[in-house]
């Protein structure tokens, strides 16, 4: 859904306003939070200590909405024609992959992370000078939602601050 909102914004003759995009991002973040809580618990793991904490579902949903909304917008803000956003997303996803392998939390989702990273490598190949392929909002927003999903599936949502620190600083 998020990819389509970015695509339609890119394709529009008159770009959508920041408020409309923000509201659409918020709506998508709410859908992600509800979907995540439907299929997963509201349990998080503090990676450093290995402590597991159960957060009330309503609080977890609010924090998930914030995480997804921030991830979408931070990744979108770092998007440019030079492949910066794609490169930073690969670094972020590989950090999630390594940490998830160390913590042994969700091995099955790691294959999705690797697949997404390989797809981004293909994009970066064609984005190199002279650029033949541009990502636009469609790609950067999809990357943001995937990063948030990967961190959520790791059951360590606060780890986003560490693994996406460069994206946050740039965005």
Model-assigned labels for residue ranges:
Residues 1-169:
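"…together with the soluble PPM/PP2C metallo-phosphatase catalytic core" -> "…together
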